Design a protein with these regions (language model features):
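Short, well-ordered coil/turn segments that N-cap beta-strands
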Residues: 29-33, 66-70, 111-115, 147-150
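N-terminal substrate-binding region of glycoside hydrolase catalytic domains
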Residues: 1-53, 57, 67, 73, ...
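Residue-identity detector for threonine
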Residues: 7, 15, 62, 97, ...
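Active-site-proximal beta-strand/loop segments in catalytic clefts of secreted hydrolases
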Residues: 36-40, 74-78, 119-122, 154-158
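Noncatalytic carbohydrate-binding groove/subsite architecture in carbohydrate-active enzymes
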Residues: 55-58, 91-170
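Sec-exported extracytoplasmic/periplasmic mature domains
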Residues: 27-31, 38, 63-64, 105-112, ...
């Protein structure tokens, strides 16, 4: 599938060859594959909704190869989009729920039997979700989208890297 390249942090793209090699590796070694699909700014329409075109191309290609993805995740750490992409790029939970519905439809078509995981949220000791009062999404996502999900993910960051702008133990 053709993938538009972003800029800066978002300038990389998985090639068809890399994807096929990952699928082959999992097949040969009996590994289960979980893959997070892009739902960041480069995969959004002007109205803010998720554009599933690249995800659909990837899923169709995977199905055509007889490949298998066991778990599809939509996005990663949406609760820090405000920091990474800017305030206007923060995805509302109601929109994310609609995006999950669109992904579930694609999964039914191309990847039946796969599980759907809600985006992994960043979570720090003491702080919880960064600026959680304003941008915390996990509880509301579970309230709105929990019935669509087979798994809800979160990323616990107990180590406090000096590079991390949200460090709580310095």
């Amino acid at each position: 599938p053709s993938v538009p390249h972003g800029t800066g942090l978002m300038s990389s793209a998985l090639t068809r060859r890399q994807w096929e090699r990952a699928l082959g590796f999992c097949e040969r070694n009996g590994c289960r594959l979980m893959f997070a699909l892009n739902c960041g700014p480069s995969a959004r329409r002007p109205d803010g909704s998720w554009n599933p075109a690249n995800a659909e191309a990837l899923m169709a290609h995977t199905a055509s190869l007889g490949g298998r993805v066991d778990i599809w995740e939509l996005g990663n750490e949406l609760n820090v989009f405000f920091f990474v992409h800017g305030l206007r790029r923060q995805v509302e939970v109601s929109q994310y729920t609609r995006d999950l519905v669109a992904l579930r439809r694609l999964m039914e078509r191309y990847s039946p039997g796969a599980l759907l995981a809600g985006q992994g949220s960043a979570f720090w000791p003491v702080l919880g979700e960064p600026l959680g009062y304003f941008f915390g999404t996990t509880r509301e996502m579970l309230r709105q989208a929990g019935g669509l999900l087979d798994a809800a993910l979160w990323h616990y960051y107990p180590q406090q890297s000096r590079r991390c702008p949200f460090g709580s133990r310095r």
